[in-house]
Amino acid sequence: MITLTNIKKTYNKGTVQALNDISFSVEKGELFGLIGPDGAGKTSLFRILTTLLLPDAGQATVDGCDVIKDYRQIRNRVGYMPGRFSLYQDLTVEENLNFFATVFGTTIKENYDLIKDIYQQIEPFKDRRAGKLSGGMKQKLALSCALIHKPSVLFLDEPTTGVDVVSRKEFWAMLKKLKQEGITILVSTPYMDEANLCDRIALVQKGDILSIDKPAGVVSSFPGELYAVRAANTHLLLQDVRSYPGTATCFAFGDALHVTFSSEAKDLKDYLHSKGHMDVSIVKIDPTIEDCFIHLLK
């Protein structure tokens, strides 16, 4: 459904690399996630796939259409929800939806079944201007507008950034329903916890793909054992654990340190006690996708 082969993109006359030889494919009906921080290249990739930006090199197709030669067909077949709210803020909810339906030669009534579950949540506010909606409602309106012409592929660029936790959960529940309708979804997010909600993910950093697999596959590839180390003074603990001779990696995760060791750490507690930490907890834990991402950055 989506294929990319050796896609490259640079800015500022080649001095800034956005995408470096990117290749992967997304199957029909798949919910595929691009996971990475700001500046990883996710938006550049979305803009290329939605025919808004030309790659410097490589080939890409969407629903069997080339992103350069067949850009008109692609624009009729895809729905795109950019990271920044881009609807007309001075138009009402209903006016925005009617506008996008008209642009694609359809009506709200014709494809209402597809957007029904989403639109019903904002329909009571259909006469409210889009600029006056909450963050969660703006996202639901933007998703409705992206779906109104019944696209075969949906591109969502960081759709839950800046949205409250409840709205984030609701949004991903909506994506699961859309997947059941047979729509192929490519979604990007900086939130590592959302990666587990995708069928497959690509971990992206500075224009490079670090790993592509199912979320469980990414986690299972983590080498060695991972431990959570806690004590009262986390800042001092971080310095002391990193200075321990057997420490391989050590990163702060909330109130704990996630640590791997290059050799057995039987005397770590004694070492930390000698540094003044009296309430040390060392527990073996399962790695998360975020742990795997940090490991791959080394």
Predicted regions located by residue number:
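ABC transporter nucleotide-binding domain
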Residues: 173-261
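Hydrophobic side chains in well-ordered alpha-helices
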Residues: 111, 214, 237-240, 267-271
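Hydrophobic C-terminal alpha-helix "anchor/cap" residues
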Residues: 116, 195, 240-242, 272-276
